[in-house]
């Protein structure tokens, strides 16, 4: 297995990974990148220092790093599709009537009319507490991700205070005015401007931020945006099809910060946690699949260098699930045809996301094919065994084992021996026999934290 060397800049990796963050917010592609374009031009107009522009750059790209952590709770509280809910919520006006109208229209879409009325009443009664909880969860997790990615505390705080408002009526801490970190003020302004210019027009986006000046936004920053929209180069860049490259050409992105293996591992692990945070039923899934993958690979005498990259592919194999609604992922009953197609799409999303990352181009197909089957009945391409690499077969075996042995929305965790028995029934069709044999041997070598998996003989 040949992979690219770690000579690419940190900015390239982060820009590419924003595709996944856009998905989890239900936003059009390149939302975070456009926000970075907008926010960086604000920062340059303010003549921020080089270190400040560097931190602002990554605050803007990673502003949504914690958003997967409240997806399941949104579905639970509002009984609706989290992706659609999040996308529509960002276009709600500031008036009470706009908020109430949004709640009535978007609550209970997965329920009967009677249940919907009861849920809506609950939201109208307790919505303030729920909103605080959801934003607190997202902000705290987003800041933690920034720290895990080794960014400065200024970046972490910029993400944590994204939803604070100039008038002190924001969340999670009701900070007011200049007590709100500058990076947060810029990021929220850039976010709202992009959402409205994509949904409507530049003119309407400008009207919206001007209407919120002194309420949501720092008036001085709004004035900067008013000046920017008079700049043809700013507007053409915002609408350009190559905006990713244009953002890559900004000064902070040009600072060459090569990644060593330890830092790359840190980044991959952090994004694996972002994926797993989307559902309570996927908590720890990516890490466990990576552990099982590595143990199987050891049994098959895969080289140390290839095992490192194989483990990274395993950590990110489900990153495409950020683009699937929790209303589907956490559904306790049988999926209908449309829902099943949505679930299947996650494998293709994984490949698309990873292919954008220079070091992962070779791994993209490998990770995205983890639901292919040897008999050709898998997805996304329906290829047969001859076209499925050994590396993919290893990840597939690890993924199936964890899917069976972990708790699911529709059943409790399955004992190891029962999971292995089911897997054995699917040898030569879905599961590679050599990989399965390696898994059985590898289970005796599990790290201590994985030795508590249930067995049929265990008392319940």
From Swiss-Prot:
GO terms for molecular function: cyclic-nucleotide phosphodiesterase activity; metal ion binding. Residues 260-455 form the HD-GYP domain. Requires a divalent metal cation for activity. Likely has a bi-nuclear metal center. Has the highest enzyme activity with Mn(2+), and when incubated with Ni(2+), its activity is about 60% lower than that observed with Mn(2+). Consists of two tandem domains of about 15% identity and similar three-dimensional topology that interact to form a pseudo-dimeric structure. The N-terminal domain (residues 1-258) plays an important regulatory role in facilitating the catalytic function of the C-terminal domain (residues 259-460). The N-terminal domain alone does not show any activity. The C-terminal domain alone is much less active comparing to the full-length protein. The full-length protein is 13 times more active than the C-terminal domain alone. It is an enzyme of class 3 (hydrolase). It catalyses: 3',3'-cGAMP + H2O = 5'-pApG-3' + H(+). PROSITE patterns: HD, HD_GYP. Monomer. Disruption phenotype: Significant increase in the ability to colonize the small intestine compared to the wild-type strain. No defect in biofilm formation. Enforced DncV expression in mutant cells lacking this gene causes an enhanced inhibition of chemotaxis. The double mutant lacking both VC_A0681 and VC_A0931 shows enhanced bacterial infectivity, and the triple one (VC_A0681, VC_A0210 and VC_A0931) has the highest infectivity, which demonstrates that V-cGAPs play non-redundant roles in cGAMP degradation. Optimum pH is 10.0. GO terms for biological process: cyclic nucleotide catabolic process. InterPro entries: Cyclic_di-GMP/3'3'-cGAMP_PDE, HD/PDEase_dom, HD_domain, HD_GYP_dom. This is 3'3'-cGAMP-specific phosphodiesterase 3. A divalent metal cation 2 binds at residues 318, 346, 370-371. Residues 28-189 form the HD domain. Induction: Expression is up-regulated by 3'3'-cGAMP production (at both mRNA and protein levels). A divalent metal cation 1 binds at residues 317-318, 399. Its cofactor is Mn(2+). Changing residue 21 to D/H: Large decrease in enzymatic activity. Keywords: Hydrolase, Manganese, Metal-binding. Its EC number is 3.1.4.-.
């Amino acid at each position: 297995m040949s992979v690219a060397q770690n000579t690419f800049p940190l900015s390239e990796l982060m820009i590419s990974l924003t595709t996944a963050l856009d998905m989890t917010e239900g936003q059009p592609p390149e939302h975070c990148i456009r926000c970075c374009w907008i926010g960086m031009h604000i920062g340059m107009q303010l003549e921020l220092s080089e270190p400040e522009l560097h931190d602002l750059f990554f605050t803007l790209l990673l502003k949504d790093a914690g958003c997967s952590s409240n997806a399941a709770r949104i579905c639970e509280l509002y009984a609706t599709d989290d992706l659609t809910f999040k996308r529509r919520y960002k276009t709600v006006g500031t008036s009470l009537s706009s908020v109430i109208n949004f709640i009535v229209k978007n609550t209970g879409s997965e329920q009967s009319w009677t249940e919907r009325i009861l849920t809506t009443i609950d939201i109208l009664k307790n919505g303030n507490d729920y909103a605080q909880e959801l934003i607190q969860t997202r902000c705290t997790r987003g800041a933690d991700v920034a720290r895990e990615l080794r960014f400065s505390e200024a970046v972490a705080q910029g993400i944590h205070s994204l939803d604070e408002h100039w008038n002190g009526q924001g969340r999670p801490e009701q900070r007011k005015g200049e007590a709100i970190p500058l990076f947060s003020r810029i990021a929220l302004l850039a976010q709202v401007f992009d959402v409205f210019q994509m949904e409507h027009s530049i003119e309407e986006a400008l009207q919206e931020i001007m209407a919120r000046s002194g309420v949501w936004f720092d008036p001085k920053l709004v004035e900067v945006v008013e000046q920017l929209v008079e700049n043809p180069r700013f507007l053409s860049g915002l609408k350009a099809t190559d905006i990713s490259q244009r953002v890559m050409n900004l000064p902070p992105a040009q600072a060459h910060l090569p990644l060593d293996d330890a830092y790359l591992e840190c980044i991959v692990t952090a994004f694996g946690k972002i994926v797993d945070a989307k559902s309570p039923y996927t908590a720890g899934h990516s890490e466990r699949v990576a552990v099982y993958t590595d143990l199987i690979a050891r049994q098959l005498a895969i080289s140390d260098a290839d095992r490192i990259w194989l483990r990274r592919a395993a950590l990110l194999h489900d990153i495409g699930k950020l683009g699937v609604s929790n209303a589907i992922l956490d559904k306790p009953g049988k999926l209908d045809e449309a829902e099943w197609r949505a679930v299947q799409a996650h494998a293709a999303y994984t490949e698309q996301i990873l292919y954008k990352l220079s070091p992962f181009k070779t791994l993209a197909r490998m990770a995205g094919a983890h639901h292919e089957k040897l008999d050709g009945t898998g997805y996304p391409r329906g290829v047969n065994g001859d076209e499925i690499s050994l590396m993919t077969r290893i990840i597939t075996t690890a993924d199936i084992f964890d899917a069976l042995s972990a708790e699911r929305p529709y059943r409790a965790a399955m004992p190891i021996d029962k999971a292995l028995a089911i897997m054995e029934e699917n040898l030569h069709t879905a599961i590679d026999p050599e990989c399965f044999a390696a898994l059985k041997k590898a289970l005796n070598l599990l790290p201590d934290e994985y030795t508590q998996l249930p067995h049929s003989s265990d008392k319940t």
